[in-house]
Amino acid sequence: MNESIVISLGGSVISGDPIDADYMKSFARILEASKYRRVGIVTGGGRTARSYISVLRKLNVNENVLDEIGIYATRMNALSMASLIPGSNPTIPFTVEDAVNLMNTYRFVVMGGTEPGHTTDTVAALLCERSATRTLINVTSVDGVYDMDPHRFANAKRFDRIGYREAIALSTKSSAGAGPNVFMDITALTIAMRSRIRVIVTSRDIDNLEKILKGDRAVSTFIDDDQRS
């Protein structure tokens, strides 16, 4: 059994309208069957977070408060996910350090956001760094990293593998602010680069994700030091 892996589970993947209960159950199933001894899962806020943030921003609520609201949404998703995974933590940790300590007790540790200004992708990267985990799977709304937004441009090219700096450059083009919708934020990518954490960006497709967990070839983008594309 391999040592450990961290998964950043985008909130939009599980917290849509309605909440995708079947996906959550399937996700729990493939985790249980995986070869990893320790699995950290960081959940995003999804539609719940975006809905509140969108409305309250129009009412001129400041960005720090909007971030706090987003964090509560991520923690609700985390507790929901943890309740479906046997052998996971019964309470949701508030900090990365708390999550790392829980990884010494539980095979599966699920958490949400931690503090304003940090996306859950950043939290996942910090969890990798703090727990000496070498691979981060980012499950998001696209099946990899593209040179353009694949939802807007039919001719967008998906990279099989790119380097950290190229990924950071592509992420820089995306919008900032609470609740951004990008393949991975700059801070998370910078943490991955400094600690040489391999990032695998992929979609919510459960069969595809299962292949990745098994180490099989799957639709995704690897972000690491290898500059081949």
Swiss-Prot record:
One of the GO BP terms on file: 'de novo' CTP biosynthetic process
UniProt entry keywords in alphabetical sequence: ATP-binding, Cytoplasm, Kinase, Nucleotide-binding, Pyrimidine biosynthesis, Transferase
Catalytic activity: UMP + ATP = UDP + ADP
Top EC class for this record: transferase
EC number annotated for this UniProt entry: 2.7.4.22
Binding site for ATP: 11-12, 46, 50, 140, 146, 149
Pathway noted in the entry: Pyrimidine metabolism; CTP biosynthesis via de novo pathway; UDP from UMP (UMPK route): step 1/1
Domain of life: Archaea
Sites where the protein binds UMP: 45, 67, 114-120
Listed GO CC annotations: cytoplasm
Cellular localization per UniProt: Cytoplasm
GO molecular function: ATP binding; UMP kinase activity
Function summary: Catalyzes the reversible phosphorylation of UMP to UDP.
Name of the protein: Uridylate kinase
